[in-house]
Amino acid sequence: MTKVSQRGITLIEMVVVVTIISLIVAITLPAVTSGLDSLRLHQAVRDVVSLFDAGLSRAERSQQVVEISVSQHDNALWIDAPDAHFERRMELPEGVSITRVLPEVPNEDESGVRSFFLYPGGSVPRFGIEMRNRRGVLRRVSVDSITGVPRITSPEEQPNG
């Protein structure tokens, strides 16, 4: 009689393989989600810079007053040029929130809307926002009142205000 050999894997081998795969996923998943949170924050910061640039250049090109509004409660920003019939709205992506609107106003209600007016040919007011992602990483986008150029910084890189 010939004995038929069977090939295959045992249940123990399968459990070991599944355990190894689970460990690999458990180790790499936090790094992947952290990377996604960083990408969301980076993109949100670039979008805010673009919005500020659009408002600043719109005021100069159209020679009209442009209003930049920030709603910390709604996690949104928008620019509005009433005389030029121009409006652009931006909501921050999920996982990114506005933590501060600069300059801070004492006893200000966070549910309110802050507005900054850009006058053509005039000096640019100093303003900005601070954003945070789920991991607690902060970025600040502020407009330099001398050059009128938006700057991206980490709050640790500059003094408050």
Language-model segments: residues:
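N-terminal helix-rich module
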Residues: 1-3, 27, 31-50, 57, ...
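N-terminal single-pass transmembrane signal-anchor helix
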Residues: 1-32
